[in-house]
C-alpha cells in the first residue's frame, strides 16, 4: 500500500508544461529541503559480462541481435572485479555498480555474484548490481550477501515500451522491482530520454516510478547514446532543455531520491550538466566508460566539480585504508575559486 501521495498524469503534465525557469526554481527549492546542494554522490559502473544478450532492447549495443562491432566477453574473474572496485574507490567513488548482459542470472552464477558483493562490501563501498530479472530466491541471496542496491530500469512509459523492447514485459520489470524491495535491497530504477518518446511518455515513466509503493532510492536519467548498428542509431538528438526539464520534474516528484545524471554526459557540455545539477541531479557515474558507452574522463569531472564548487559524498573509509582516497577527497572539496563557475547565473 502506498505510503505517500500518489501523482496523477495531469499533475505531471502540468509540471512539464511549466516555464523552465519556474520549474528549475521549484526543483532547486525541493532539492535543498532534502539534500546538501553542494554534495554529489559518485558511482562507478563496471560491465562484468559484456555482449551476447538475448534481449532486443533497441538502444543497446550489447544485444546479440544487432551488429554493433561489440565483442562478447565472458564473466570476469572475481579478482578482476575486485581490482576494478579498488581503483574506483581510490578514484573517489562511494558506490560500485556491476552489470551483466543477460536476461536473468542462472543459479550456477549465484555463488560467484555473492562472492563479488561480499568482496566489494569489505572495501567499504556500497554495492549495486544490474543483472536483469530476478526471482525471489535470487533477490534474497543477493540481499543476504550484502547487496545495497539493485538497478532495473523501466526505460519509458508503459504505452511506449513495446516500441523499444519485446523480449521482456513491463510487468516483469515491475515484478523484479517488487522482489528486490521485498528482499530488503534498495531500488535503483529510471529511464532513457531520446528513444523517440513523447513528453507524455516521459511523464508516464516518472509517474510509474514516483507511484511505486516506495519510490526508488536512486533514479538514473539517461540521455540516449546512439550506437551505430542499433535500431535507434539515427534518432533525433535530445534537446538539452527537454532533458533538463525531465531532471527537474523527477526531482519534484521524488524529493528524497538521488537523481543520477547517467548515460549521455559525454555529449553534454559543462553548461548543460551544471543546469542538470541546478535542476536537482545529485549523482553521477564516474569513469571513462558506462558498460560499453563513453563517459567523461575522471579528470574532466574533477575540473567540473571544482568549477561548480561541488563535493563528492564522503565514502566510508575503513581503518587502515589507503591515504590516497582521503587526499583525493580533500582536493575535490577545495573549490578552484579563480575558475569558479556561477551556476546561479545561468
Curated annotation (Swiss-Prot):
Say which species the protein is native to.
Salmonella arizonae (strain ATCC BAA-731 / CDC346-86 / RSK2980)
Gene Ontology terms: biological process: biotin biosynthetic process
Keyword terms: 2Fe-2S, 4Fe-4S, Biotin biosynthesis, Iron, Iron-sulfur, Metal-binding, S-adenosyl-L-methionine, Transferase
Q: Which NCBIfam families match?
A: bioB (TIGR00433)
Q: Which PANTHER family match?
A: BIOTIN SYNTHASE, BIOTIN SYNTHASE, MITOCHONDRIAL
Superkingdom per UniProt: Bacteria
* Annotated cofactor note: Binds 1 [4Fe-4S] cluster. The cluster is coordinated with 3 cysteines and an exchangeable S-adenosyl-L-methionine. Binds 1 [2Fe-2S] cluster. The cluster is coordinated with 3 cysteines and 1 arginine.
Q: Name one GO molecular function term.
A: 2 iron, 2 sulfur cluster binding
Q: Which InterPro entries match?
A: Aldolase_TIM, BATS_dom, Biotin_synth/BioAB, Biotin_synthase, Elp3/MiaA/NifB-like_rSAM, rSAM
- Which family would the database say this protein is a member of? Belongs to the radical SAM superfamily. Biotin synthase family.
Lineage here is: Bacteria, Pseudomonadati, Pseudomonadota, Gammaproteobacteria, Enterobacterales
Per its UniProt record, what CDD domains does this chain match? Radical_SAM (cd01335)
Report what the protein is called.
Biotin synthase
- What does the subunit comment say? Homodimer.
The signal peptide stretch is none
Q: What's the stated role of this polypeptide?
A: Catalyzes the conversion of dethiobiotin (DTB) to biotin by the insertion of a sulfur atom into dethiobiotin via a radical-based mechanism.
- Residue span, Radical SAM core domain: 38-256
- The UniProt annotation places [4Fe-4S] cluster binding at 53, 57, 60
Look up the record and name the cofactor or cofactors this protein needs: [4Fe-4S] cluster; [2Fe-2S] cluster
Q: Which HAMAP family match?
A: BioB
Binding sites annotated in the UniProt record for [2Fe-2S] cluster: 97, 128, 188, 260
Into which EC class is this enzyme placed?
A: transferase
Q: What is its EC number?
A: 2.8.1.6
